[in-house]
Regions:
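Fe-S ferredoxin-like electron-transfer domains
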Residues: 46-191, 197, 204-223
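Short, contiguous strand/loop micro-motifs
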Residues: 6-7, 139-140, 182, 238-241
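Short, well-ordered turn and helix-capping elements at secondary-structure junctions
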Residues: 8-10, 180, 335
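Iron-sulfur-associated redox domains of electron-transfer enzymes in respiratory
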Residues: 13-71, 75, 79-81, 91, ...
Length: 522
């Protein structure tokens, strides 16, 4: 350990830690805009500058190593003025439409300006008029609000391995965009929305379907049916100001009915169908010489990733639809017939933790006879906004059960939202199908957790099955490249597009730290 002084306090730093890491661990706040936890620092925004005794200039705390005996000052007039000037310069060319911005009240730049007491605009910069990119069904890009922090670029390239966006141009003409100035719909974007989660301003936001859903709820000729994913019930609490990880499943069902939805179904029901189908398919492929390793097919961002970057692995994908699309198909076929309803008059809405689900429901193969199985997808954030719009207090709702017959679920369906959950549930099903016995639960939990790639080998009635679970598409690349190179000990691979799984999806509450995401998993 190395000891140094910060604002008169003694701070212990681990070897290799930066000043910022040591200060944050001790609860000392230093503002940043470009910093991303877990990635090497760039020092681009300079908001984290501090004074170090003996060093003539201000130093970036995010990249300056903590050293024994150094004396650091984080809030001197010189430091505070430097931070104010940086934010004032960022605001000099930033749009003034905060009241109409999707991130109003949750904008890092807005909060910094408030915290630093900036009430006037001392600098006037050029505000270039750049068109909104609304080409993607999942994400809206507003280049005029981009502050070039680089967080979206790093997320897309380093964590997701997609590189759909990058810095374009030089100097004051630099901007972030897709190749050749095209829209996101023509780029390699997989619609995961992870860029949206790390964007500090309103430069990136989801393509909202909220107005369309509200209009449908007000149409007496429509039967509006809603399904909700298991990951939503453990994250919606944050939108209502409750403790992260609080499971509000029953209250959410009651709130959805209060909003006016005619029927409320639990997507965990079709997650159970997915588990049984994938388990059966795995057994058949392993025992009858099918294409291996079998790859899960629940995550739409991952499916687009395979189609674009690894088309040779398309035969390896499970034949299952995602639980969302399974439920949508059942609602507009079996359930509609049972209820005596015209599928064309059913509005099928899903509440998902994922922006890529908005893309998935628009795929032509998900609209037999040109009638989409799922009409609209709302993210967890959009549902939170809808509750506030309608004045529904989630915490005050009495818990209710989802409607039958699609309100029943097993515990296996509930764990779908966490990385490793699909794999664990499918392996348990495969084990039961082969042996007639439940698998030892403690051992299979090796597939859970936040590790990017997890592996597990199990013997099922003399049959050796190697399984791996990866979350984050850069980790998916690693596994697929190993299989391409000749690795043969894996028969089943689960891929979740988002790091940690759906609990950390692109449609989840903004501003959640790792502690909050872990609480959702638990």
């Amino acid at each position: 350990m190395r000891e140094f002084e910060a604002d008169g306090r003694s701070i212990q730093a681990e070897p290799g830690e930066t000043i910022l890491e040591a200060l944050r661990r001790e609860g000392i706040h230093v503002p940043t805009l470009c910093h991303m936890e877990g990635l090497p620092p760039t020092g681009a925004c300079r908001l984290c500058v501090v004074e170090v005794e003996g060093v003539p200039g201000l130093v970036p705390a995010c990249s300056y190593p903590a050293a024994e005996g150094m004396k650091v000052r984080t809030r001197t007039p010189r430091v505070l003025q430097a931070r104010r000037t940086i934010v004032e310069l960022l605001l000099s060319s930033h749009p003034d439409d905060c009241l109409y911005c999707a991130r109003s009240g949750r904008c890092d730049l807005q909060k910094l300006a408030t915290d630093l007491g900036i009430r006037q605009r001392p600098y006037r910069g050029v505000q270039p008029r750049q068109e909104l990119d609304v080409s993607s069904p999942s994400i809206i890009r507003d280049p005029s609000k981009c502050i070039l922090c680089g967080r979206c670029v790093r997320m897309c390239e380093e964590i997701q391995g997609v590189s759909a966006i990058d810095f374009i141009g030089r100097g004051s003409r630099t901007y972030v965009g897709a190749a050749f100035g095209s829209g996101l719909n023509l780029s390699s974007c997989v619609n995961c929305g992870q860029c949206l989660l790390v964007c500090p301003t309103g430069a990136l936001s989801e393509h909202s379907s909220l107005d369309a859903v509200v209009a449908a709820l007000g149409d007496p000729t429509k039967t509006v049916v809603v399904q909700h994913a298991p990951a939503v019930s453990v994250s919606l609490a944050e939108e209502a100001g409750l403790k992260p990880g609080t499971d509000v499943d029953g209250q959410m069902v009651a709130a959805l009915r209060r909003l006016g939805f005619n029927y409320v179904f639990d997507t965990s029901f079709t997650a159970d169908l997915t588990i049984m189908e994938e388990g059966s398919e795995l057994v058949e492929r392993v025992t009858k010489g099918g294409v291996l390793p079998m790859l899960t097919s629940c995550s739409p961002g991952w499916i687009k990733f395979v189609e674009q970057f690894y088309p040779d692995f398309i035969p390896n994908l499970s034949t299952c639809k995602s639980p969302q699309q399974m439920m949508g198909a059942i609602i507009k076929s079996f359930w509609a017939e049972r209820q005596g309803l015209d599928p064309a008059r059913i509005v099928s809405v899903s509440i998902m933790p994922c922006t890529a689900k908005k893309f998935e429901c628009t795929r032509p193969e998900m609209a037999p006879a040109h009638v989409p199985d799922v009409d609209y997808v709302l993210t967890t954030r959009e549902l939170g906004q809808m509750l506030r719009m309608f004045g529904v207090d989630l915490a005050a709702m009495e818990p209710q059960a989802a409607d039958t017959p699609f309100g029943e679920r097993s515990s296996a369906g509930k764990i779908f939202g966490a990385s490793g959950g699909v794999m664990e549930a499918a392996l348990r099903s495969a084990h039961f199908l082969i042996t007639g016995r439940e698998i030892e639960h403690v051992r299979i939990q090796a597939l859970r957790g936040f590790k990017g790639i997890k592996e597990f080998h199990v013997e099922i009635d003399g049959l050796e099955v190697g399984a791996a679970a990866a979350s984050g598409l850069a980790n998916a690349r690693t596994l697929l490249d190993q299989v391409r190179a000749g690795r043969r000990d894996l028969q089943f691979i689960e891929i979740m597009t988002c790091p940690g799984g759906c609990i950390n999806g692109g449609g989840q509450p903004i501003g959640a730290d790792l502690k909050a995401v872990r609480a959702r998993m638990e």
